C-alpha cells in the first residue's frame, strides 16, 4: 500500500468513525427525556394497541411473555388479562411504578423489572412471546435491540410489535422535531421500525415469517391546541425539545406542529381526531 493510499484509507476510517453516533450518549439523553414529563398520561390512552397486539399473537394462558420498553404497561396488562406469565420491563423506574400500580388495581400478578432493551437480563429462549408497543423502536442501536428480542424468544415463539410508521402522524411529528433539533449524525430513525423493509433487515434471517398489518390509532383531544398542551407537558421527548429551543424557535415548532395536526384532523367539529398509522408486526422465530 502506497503512502497516498494509506492516507486515503486513514481519512476514510476517520470519516466513518466521525459519522458514527455515540449510541451510549444518545441512550443517556433518551432515558432522561422519557423520565421527564409523565408519559403514562399519554400511554394509558394507547391501551387498545396492546390489546389488539395480544389478539394478533393469539396468546394462550400460561405462556411466558416479555414486554420490552413497556412504558406504563399496556401490552403487559393485556397479556396478564389473558392469564399469561408476564415480565414487564423498562429502563425508566417511574414508568414501571405506574405499570405496577395499574396491575395492583386490577389484581393482576406481573413481574416488573428495570431493563435495557439492548441488554436484556434473561437467558436465551426464555419466553414464548416477546412484545413491545411503541417502545423498542426507540432503542438507539436497532440491530442490537432486535438481536436481543430474538435471543430471549424461544424457537417457534413470536415477537409482536407495534411501531409508528414514517408517514403517520407520529412519524411526521418526529420529522418536524428533527427540523428544529436534528438527531445525531448517522442515527437511524425510530420510525424505520414501522417499515417492512427495515424489519426484514433486522429479523429476516432469523424469522420463519414476518406478518405486518398497517393499523391506525385515533388521537382524540379537545382541539389541536389541547393535543399540543398535553404532549408538551407529559411527552418527555417533546417537553425536552421545547425546553432546548430559544423562544423564537419554540414558536416556530409550535406553529408547525399545530399545522400538521390541523391538516390531519378528521373531526368535523372543534375537537381533534387524528388517525396515526402504525405497523402491527407478528414475527415467528425460526
List the model feature ranges, each with a label.
Residues 128-142:
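A short SAM/SAH-binding and catalytic strip from SAM-dependent methyltransferases
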Residues 191-286:
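Conserved Class I S-adenosyl-L-methionine
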Residues 143-158:
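A short glycine-rich, Lys/Arg-flanked "PGG" loop and its adjoining helix->strand segment in the class I
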Residues 64-119, 129, 144:
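Class I SAM-dependent methyltransferase SAM/SAH-binding core
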Residues 13-63, 74, 98, 158-182, 228, ...:
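Conserved class I S-adenosyl-L-methionine
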Amino acid at each position: 500500500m502506497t503512502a497516498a493510499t494509506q492516507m486515503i484509507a486513514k481519512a476514510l476510517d476517520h470519516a466513518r468513525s466521525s459519522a458514527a453516533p455515540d449510541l451510549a450518549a444518545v441512550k443517556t439523553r433518551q432515558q432522561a427525556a422519557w423520565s421527564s414529563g409523565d408519559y403514562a398520561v399519554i400511554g394509558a390512552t394507547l391501551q387498545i394497541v396492546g390489546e389488539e397486539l395480544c389478539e394478533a399473537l393469539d396468546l394462550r394462558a400460561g405462556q411466558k411473555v416479555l414486554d420490552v420498553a413497556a412504558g406504563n404497561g399496556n401490552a403487559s396488562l393485556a397479556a396478564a388479562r389473558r392469564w399469561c406469565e408476564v415480565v414487564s420491563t423498562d429502563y425508566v423506574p417511574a414508568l414501571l411504578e405506574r405499570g405496577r400500580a395499574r396491575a395492583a388495581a386490577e389484581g393482576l400478578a406481573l413481574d416488573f423489572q428495570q431493563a435495557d432493551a439492548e441488554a436484556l437480563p434473561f437467558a436465551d429462549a426464555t419466553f414464548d412471546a416477546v412484545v413491545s408497543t411503541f417502545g423498542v423502536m426507540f432503542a438507539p442501536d436497532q440491530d442490537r435491540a432486535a438481536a436481543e428480542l430474538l435471543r430471549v424468544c424461544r424457537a417457534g415463539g413470536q415477537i409482536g410489535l407495534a411501531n409508528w410508521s414514517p408517514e403517520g402522524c407520529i412519524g411526521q411529528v418526529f420529522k418536524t422535531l428533527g427540523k428544529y433539533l436534528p438527531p445525531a449524525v448517522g442515527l437511524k430513525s425510530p420510525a424505520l421500525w414501522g417499515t417492512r423493509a427495515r424489519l426484514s433487515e433486522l429479523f429476516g434471517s432469523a424469522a420463519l415469517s414476518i406478518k405486518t398489518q398497517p393499523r391506525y390509532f385515533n388521537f382524540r383531544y379537545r382541539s389541536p391546541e389541547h393535543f399540543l398542551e398535553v404532549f408538551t407537558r407529559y411527552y418527555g421527548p417533546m417537553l425536552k425539545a421545547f425546553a432546548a429551543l430559544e423562544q423564537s424557535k419554540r414558536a416556530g415548532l409550535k406553529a408547525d406542529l399545530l399545522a400538521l395536526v390541523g391538516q390531519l384532523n378528521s373531526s368535523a367539529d372543534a375537537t381533534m381526531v387524528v388517525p396515526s398509522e402504525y405497523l402491527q408486526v407478528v414475527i415467528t422465530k425460526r
